[in-house]
């Protein structure tokens, strides 16, 4: 770890189409090899597909999906007296969105649809309906935290 001060967090700019910072962060997560234009096209096409399929505003559907994906609790390893315990801790707001976006994009990439735009759109719609792999990931994380509730007093 660095001995110097922690680097300041850089502020992401809101995207031009939806004027939303979380959409910019989604574009950054989808981006591969620095191809931001391609990533933006994928995300915006997915949002258009969501709008056509649901008839609702794509940004609202996306925000509902993110609320259903973002974890409230997670477990962290804590070493006490020579053994490791999985200690449940609350997730900070910044980490909640980061984990939610990471799980959403990873679940989208693992899907079977033909194009990434379709995979992302379907995963967002599934998450908005409380189904899909990304929501399952959140449920598994919460289950793990619940199972290890006995070690909550080791919190730091």
UniProtKB/Swiss-Prot annotation:
<dbReference type="Pfam" id="PF00177">
    <property type="entry name" value="Ribosomal_S7"/>
</dbReference>
<comment type="function">
    <text>One of the primary rRNA binding proteins, it binds directly to 16S rRNA where it nucleates assembly of the head domain of the 30S subunit. Is located at the subunit interface close to the decoding center, probably blocks exit of the E-site tRNA.</text>
</comment>
<dbReference type="GO" id="GO:0019843">
    <property type="term" value="F:rRNA binding"/>
</dbReference>
<keyword id="KW-0687">Ribonucleoprotein</keyword>
<dbReference type="InterPro" id="IPR036823">
    <property type="entry name" value="Ribosomal_uS7_dom_sf"/>
</dbReference>
<dbReference type="InterPro" id="IPR023798">
    <property type="entry name" value="Ribosomal_uS7_dom"/>
</dbReference>
<dbReference type="GO" id="GO:0000049">
    <property type="term" value="F:tRNA binding"/>
</dbReference>
<keyword id="KW-0694">RNA-binding</keyword>
<protein>
    <recommendedName>
        <fullName>Small ribosomal subunit protein uS7</fullName>
    </recommendedName>
</protein>
<dbReference type="InterPro" id="IPR020606">
    <property type="entry name" value="Ribosomal_uS7_CS"/>
</dbReference>
<keyword id="KW-0820">tRNA-binding</keyword>
<comment type="similarity">
    <text>Belongs to the universal ribosomal protein uS7 family.</text>
</comment>
<dbReference type="GO" id="GO:0015935">
    <property type="term" value="C:small ribosomal subunit"/>
</dbReference>
<dbReference type="InterPro" id="IPR005717">
    <property type="entry name" value="Ribosomal_uS7_bac/org-type"/>
</dbReference>
<dbReference type="InterPro" id="IPR000235">
    <property type="entry name" value="Ribosomal_uS7"/>
</dbReference>
<comment type="subunit">
    <text>Part of the 30S ribosomal subunit. Contacts proteins S9 and S11.</text>
</comment>
<dbReference type="GO" id="GO:0003735">
    <property type="term" value="F:structural constituent of ribosome"/>
</dbReference>
<dbReference type="GO" id="GO:0006412">
    <property type="term" value="P:translation"/>
</dbReference>
<keyword id="KW-0689">Ribosomal protein</keyword>
<keyword id="KW-0699">rRNA-binding</keyword>
């Amino acid at each position: 770890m660095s001995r110097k001060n922690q680097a300041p967090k850089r502020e992401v700019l809101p995207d031009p189409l939806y004027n939303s910072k979380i959409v910019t962060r989604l574009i950054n997560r989808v981006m591969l090899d620095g191809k931001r234009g391609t990533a933006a096209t994928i995300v915006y096409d997915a949002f258009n597909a969501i709008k056509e399929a649901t008839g609702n505003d794509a940004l609202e559907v996306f925000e509902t999906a993110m609320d259903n994906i973002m974890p409230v609790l997670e477990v962290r390893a804590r070493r006490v007296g020579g053994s490791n315990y999985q200690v449940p801790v609350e997730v900070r707001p910044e980490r909640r969105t980061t984990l939610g976006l990471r799980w959403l994009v990873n679940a989208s990439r693992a899907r079977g649809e033909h194009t990434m735009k379709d995979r992302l759109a379907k995963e967002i719609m599934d998450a908005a309906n409380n189904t899909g792999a990304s929501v399952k990931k959140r449920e598994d994380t919460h289950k793990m935290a619940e199972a290890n509730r006995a070690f909550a007093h080791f919190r730091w």
